[in-house]
């Protein structure tokens, strides 16, 4: 069992990487999962969990259910179980479950503990660590949420055996995101080695990057923004396609392609660097046939991104390989020219 400490001022915790251990709790625990994950992995967790009382809340699977209705379902289950401030919630699932359970925990009785047990690669390397929680609204993605850290995170790679290839690749997109912005060495590992042979090493390294970034910038005031590479465009893509056509990681991959195009046009990437990042995305089949239906509407959606300030869109763009820059005040014409490539 490998451990990664995330030392924060208000709430430090550990990420455990290895076979899920027996978890003994002296309080009530509400497990929240989705309809697919519960069928695959709930019994595995229940065999390893001992608590004063355990109940399960199952919600529908998918990004489109990351909404107020599902949040209300979680909170109602907590009230019906009579959870108190000493109780906790357990998130068993992917990024959608992790985000919603974290948010529910942050507002129930003004905050109770929760544990993340991520079952997708995307959630293991990204969503379950760092304390970003939230739900989507008709206006955009994650526009209601909070920064709220888990009590602990348990990453068991055995969960990934049931993942479809598409889900796995979506998680790889988030790994590439971190590598391109923060770690040249990880880029080289992804370029030169078979991921199946080094998956545990790559997951450990990805979580370590996330841990270092979150430790330095928990509330996303500066360096943590680098974790949003591809997200300004990606969130607009998800909204345009009603959260149904693409998985989150797939939309982020398309967003990274767009960000690369913008970085190249601004001279932040050389053609060689641009092609290197593009080739890495292609290696993992993160190439998609996507066309923007209405460029002006798409452009306007970019302003709903949480990073936007004073009617200015902020983009996280790669600056070479292993670094990034927060770019703002980019002329509309420059952005539109990039979008036209995808029209």
Swiss-Prot record:
InterPro entries according to UniProt = Dehydroquinate_synthase, DHQ_synth_AroB, DHQ_synth_fam, DHQS/DOIS_N, DHQS_C
Q: What is its main location?
A: cytoplasm
Tell me the route in metabolism or biology where this protein functions.
Metabolic intermediate biosynthesis; chorismate biosynthesis; chorismate from D-erythrose 4-phosphate and phosphoenolpyruvate: step 2/7
Subcellular locations according to the entry? Cytoplasm
Q: Please explain the role this protein plays, according to its UniProt record.
A: Catalyzes the conversion of 3-deoxy-D-arabino-heptulosonate 7-phosphate (DAHP) to dehydroquinate (DHQ).
Q: What is this protein called?
A: 3-dehydroquinate synthase
Query: GO CC terms on record?
Result: cytoplasm
């Amino acid at each position: 069992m490998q451990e990664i400490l995330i030392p924060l001022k208000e709430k430090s915790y550990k990420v455990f990487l290895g076979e899920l251990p027996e978890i003994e709790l002296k309080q009530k625990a509400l497990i929240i999962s989705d309809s697919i994950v519960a069928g695959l992995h709930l019994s595995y967790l229940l065999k390893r969990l001992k608590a004063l009382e355990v109940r399960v809340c199952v919600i529908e699977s998918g990004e489109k259910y990351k909404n107020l209705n599902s949040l209300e379902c979680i909170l109602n289950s907590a009230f019906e179980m009579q959870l108190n401030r000493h109780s906790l919630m357990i998130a068993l699932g992917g990024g959608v479950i992790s985000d919603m359970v974290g948010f529910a925990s942050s507002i129930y009785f003004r905050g109770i503990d929760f544990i993340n047990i991520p079952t997708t690669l995307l959630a293991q390397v990204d969503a379950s660590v760092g304390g970003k929680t939230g739900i989507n609204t008709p206006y955009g993605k994650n526009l209601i949420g909070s920064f709220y850290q888990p009590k602990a995170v348990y990453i068991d790679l055995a969960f990934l055996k049931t993942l479809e290839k598409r889900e796995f690749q979506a998680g790889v997109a988030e790994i590439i995101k971190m590598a391109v912005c923060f770690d040249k060495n990880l880029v080289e590992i992804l370029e030169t080695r078979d991921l199946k042979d080094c998956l545990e090493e790559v997951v450990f390294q990805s979580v370590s990057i996330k841990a270092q970034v979150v430790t330095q910038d928990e509330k996303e005031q500066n360096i943590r923004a680098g974790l949003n590479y591809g997200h300004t465009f990606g969130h607009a893509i998800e909204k345009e396609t009603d959260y149904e056509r693409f998985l989150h990681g797939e939309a982020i991959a398309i967003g990274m392609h767009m960000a690369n195009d913008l970085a190249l046009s601004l001279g932040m990437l050389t053609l060689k660097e641009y092609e290197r990042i593009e080739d890495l995305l292609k290696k993992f089949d993160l190439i998609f046939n996507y066309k923007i239906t209405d460029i002006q509407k798409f452009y306007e959606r970019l302003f709903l991104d949480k990073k936007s300030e004073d009617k200015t869109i902020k983009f996280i763009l790669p600056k070479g390989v292993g670094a990034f820059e927060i770019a703002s005040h980019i002329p509309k014409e420059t952005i539109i020219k990039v979008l036209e490539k995808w029209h």
